[in-house]
Amino acid sequence: MPVGFLGDPLIRLRAIAVAHPDHPLHKLGRKLSHRDLRAHRHLVVRESGTQRTTRALTVEATQRWTVSHLATSVQAARMGYGFAWYPEDAIRDELAQGTLKPLRLREGEVRFAELYLIIAERDDPGPGTLRLARIIREAVKSECPKEMTTAA
């Protein structure tokens, strides 16, 4: 959330570390350390914010591929080019089909990211802002799995 703003939580995303089933990290046959991860290519989706300071789903690695879209990163992981943390909901098909497999980590196997609804002019929002906020809340309530939603 940007500094100086308040917001209402909408969705809590659960992200898991994954790689192709034949990736060398899976072949180690044990829980992985951050040192293990640093020795392999980390796939990262570029942040769209102006400050780009979030490191919620990244780890320092000797090699990193940064791409613009989640789908591109998932495809690279499916092809065995690296590992990444992805929102579990976004890779359900790949997990079910076995094209991606969760990595067993000593720590950090699962990470969470929160999505907030922020209204900049909270004290005096216009009718359009209020309507859009209501539409967003309704869409989250009807389209997102209940376990993901945090909105009242």
State the predicted function of each range.
Residues 2-81, 86-111, 130, 134, ...:
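C-terminal regulatory
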Residues 18-22, 114-125:
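A bilobed periplasmic-binding-protein/Venus flytrap-type ligand-binding module shared by bacterial periplasmic
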